[in-house]
Amino acid sequence: MGRVPLAWWLALCCWGCAAHKDTQTEAGSPFVGNPGNITGARGLTGTLRCELQVQGEPPEVVWLRDGQILELADNTQTQVPLGEDWQDEWKVVSQLRISALQLSDAGEYQCMVHLEGRTFVSQPGFVGLEGLPYFLEEPEDKAVPANTPFNLSCQAQGPPEPVTLLWLQDAVPLAPVTGHSSQHSLQTPGLNKTSSFSCEAHNAKGVTTSRTATITVLPQRPHHLHVVSRQPTELEVAWTPGLSGIYPLTHCNLQAVLSDDGVGIWLGKSDPPEDPLTLQVSVPPHQLRLEKLLPHTPYHIRISCSSSQGPSPWTHWLPVETTEGVPLGPPENVSAMRNGSQVLVRWQEPRVPLQGTLLGYRLAYRGQDTPEVLMDIGLTREVTLELRGDRPVANLTVSVTAYTSAGDGPWSLPVPLEPWRPGQGQPLHHLVSEPPPRAFSWPWWYVLLGALVAAACVLILALFLVHRRKKETRYGEVFEPTVERGELVVRYRVRKSYSRRTTEATLNSLGISEELKEKLRDVMVDRHKVALGKTLGEGEFGAVMEGQLNQDDSILKVAVKTMKIAICTRSELEDFLSEAVCMKEFDHPNVMRLIGVCFQGSDREGFPEPVVILPFMKHGDLHSFLLYSRLGDQPVFLPTQMLVKFMADIASGMEYLSTKRFIHRDLAARNCMLNENMSVCVADFGLSKKIYNGDYYRQGRIAKMPVKWIAIESLADRVYTSKSDVWSFGVTMWEIATRGQTPYPGVENSEIYDYLRQGNRLKQPVDCLDGLYALMSRCWELNPRDRPSFAELREDLENTLKALPPAQEPDEILYVNMDEGGSHLEPRGAAGGADPPTQPDPKDSCSCLTAADVHSAGRYVLCPSTAPGPTLSADRGCPAPPGQEDGA
């Protein structure tokens, strides 16, 4: 019992000593609570708190970090009275909030107050930052040539330290985390395929992964660009392609510019003073012949080759020059004047391009019974001939030609002698031994006059040809301006003997694939059997004309579809012909069929233009027909029976195409045609594809597509199936039901995908049968498997058509006269209001009346035109829209 009181006594003494020590440490300080310590990860939120008790008015608490005042600190101060008299004693609590903790927030924090002229500072609290590594630098995307070294950078920091980096290529680690050093820079010797790189930062808290950088491998710069052969109008160049990794080269682009004065100023720069013209060529071979160039003309060329990953860097500009050519025309104004035994011959330099450096002139003269004599005159343009001998020279004529290092140019027409006239200048004495002259035996003035007339005709023809050549080619006709896709067109002039070429030679000259040529051989038609008529429609790249095809026993009225090959690229030519051969396999009353293909010579270039021969469609395309029936000068009413028949025809044609494993991809009312029997034919197979394996087709290249008609899965993944055409058919049904309205009015093309993903669909048209709209809605199911087949659609539409009553003339017709003064009439009667329209006076009535069908949903009033607007039943013909009465 004696030991226990002793232990309590010792403990009480120790507590008293400690309390005395704390009182000394905190003597006079008002702080009763000091800031604590915070350790957190980057981005977290922390709070520091301090408390003090004071007598009298509460002071303002200021926060310090590392001894510096925090001017913009997010702190709150709370004051609580402790005594009954609020002026006696106060408790003050200050809280500092640190949001989104960063490395700069770490340090020592204290509270500071000023009381009675003294400054008091609390005990410090510490804020530390510890968490996952933070990236200061991440790898960036790059495009590098194949097998070319490059560097990537990545840098991260803690705390806590140390931070080590691990590089990954295509999600595979390149090296393990070892040691305490970070590999900030990755040096790669080169790649042969496009790869992705990222880095991982490791510390004691865990791992952070950087962004993924894509390194695209491009072909190396081509090298050894050189000239293989030179001609006056041709250059053959070759080059060695650079490495392209695992991606084969698809094509090369050749740029060429004329070397104007001052070319040396921009030769070392990337861009010349004017935009160069670009020619795209397929490879291999890595060789190209440039034709139709200007003789004796300097050019600069460079080359870049492309793979599926992108283009290589351009080579340096290479100066090249064509060789000299012969002069294009003879010397001008050749004259030969006789003065006794001397003949003075004069001429002027050719006005047309010399195509080289003029080296001199050659002169030839001969008489009626004497051989021709050739002389090299040099660069002079005047020479005197002295005729000697016993025999006179009868009917002497003179011709002159200019020559360059490439040879002689054209000779001038033979010029007869003229008598000497005073004032012609002093002749040069170039003596030539000849027999003595004798008088001409017949009047030579007539010969001179005829020669002058002939020379004038030749001169006019030569000037016309030269002017045409200058106008058509600055670069010699090898290059043409760019077209919409950015490709360049190679144009050339063939001989006028094109009409004698065989079909095989014509196909070979087009530069198309062997597979397409094989298909075209089966559908070729003799060009002379086709007669062209008026133009039905014309666009930027082609036209449709009315024509006649002479068959063995009859003449068939056809539509002829042509292409302006002078402004189209080779790929567009192949697309045009592929659409034609696509139709040769079709044999169905509701599918456009192909009659044949032929080629005609271009009047301007002589290059064969493709011509596709199709059946003649009297009423044009379905969309225009529907639109003009509603908005044309003479609107007509289309009964529901006719609209349903249009839908059934299209469904029947698409059912046939689906059985042939064809995907249309561009089904719309504009691509359906109406023949003379008002039957619809599915047409325009420019985007159609035949699927040989499986039941879908994935589009490889980005092409212009009608997004408002495309199925939602095709917009997302560019995957097309027969059920994608079913979606488009539903939109086409909506077009027909609305008489040609545009789908999704008010919705931009760029917004269609999001609009459909939200579950939105086309609304039910006015006066559309509920069953028809339900059929449309089934075509727009999100899951393609839930959509009906074309066989089901055709059957449902045919049953709907059978269930409808026969089309008859409307029982209730409303006639409204809309004269110039009709604008003051009350509109509510005509719009379906309670009051009927006032009956006009018969004497003021216009003889031009418009019939409007009255439905249960409301009445329609159509403004009159110069002739009454008839109603159209399913078994009656319908006038075509203006400008569309004929067409394919």
From Swiss-Prot:
Activity regulation text: Activated by GAS6-binding and subsequent autophosphorylation.
Active-site residues from the entry: D666 (proton acceptor)
The protein's name: Tyrosine-protein kinase receptor UFO
Gene3D superfamilies listed in its UniProt record: Immunoglobulins (2.60.40.10), Phosphorylase Kinase, domain 1 (3.30.200.20), Transferase(Phosphotransferase) domain 1 (1.10.510.10)
Subunit structure and binding partners: Heterodimer and heterotetramer with ligand GAS6. Interacts with CBL, GRB2, LCK, NCK2, PIK3R1, PIK3R2, PIK3R3, PLCG1, SOCS1 and TNS2. Part of a complex including AXL, TNK2 and GRB2, in which GRB2 promotes AXL recruitment by TNK2.
Keywords assigned: ATP-binding, Cell membrane, Differentiation, Disulfide bond, Glycoprotein, Immunity, Immunoglobulin domain, Innate immunity, Kinase, Membrane, Nucleotide-binding, Oncogene, Phosphoprotein, Receptor, Repeat, Signal, Transferase, Transmembrane, Transmembrane helix, Tyrosine-protein kinase, Ubl conjugation
CDD domains cross-referenced by the UniProt entry: FN3, PTKc_Axl
Subcellular location field: Cell membrane
Amino-acid positions noted as binding ATP in the UniProt annotation, renumbered to this chain: L536, G537, E538, G539, E540, F541, G542, A543, V544, K561
Catalysed reaction equations from the record: L-tyrosyl-[protein] + ATP = O-phospho-L-tyrosyl-[protein] + ADP + H(+)
MF annotations from Gene Ontology: ATP binding; phosphatidylserine binding; transmembrane receptor protein tyrosine kinase activity; virus receptor activity
Residue ranges annotated for the Fibronectin type-III domain, each copy included: 221-325, 330-422
Ranges per topology, Cytoplasmic: 467-888
Membrane topology per record: Single-pass type I membrane protein
Tissue-by-tissue expression: In distinct substructures of a broad spectrum of developing tissues (in the late embryogenesis). In cells forming organ capsules as well as in connective tissue structures (in adult).
PANTHER family for the chain: TYROSINE-PROTEIN KINASE RECEPTOR (PTHR24416), TYROSINE-PROTEIN KINASE RECEPTOR UFO (PTHR24416:SF323)
Biological processes per GO annotation: apoptotic cell clearance; apoptotic process; blood vessel remodeling; cell maturation; cellular response to interferon-alpha; cellular response to lipopolysaccharide; dendritic cell differentiation; enzyme-linked receptor protein signaling pathway
InterPro entries named in the record: FN3_dom (IPR003961), FN3_sf (IPR036116), Ig-like_dom (IPR007110), Ig-like_dom_sf (IPR036179), Ig-like_fold (IPR013783), Ig_sub (IPR003599), Kinase-like_dom_sf (IPR011009), Prot_kinase_dom (IPR000719)
Glycosylated residues in this chain: N37, N151, N192, N333, N339, N395
Entry EC number(s): 2.7.10.1
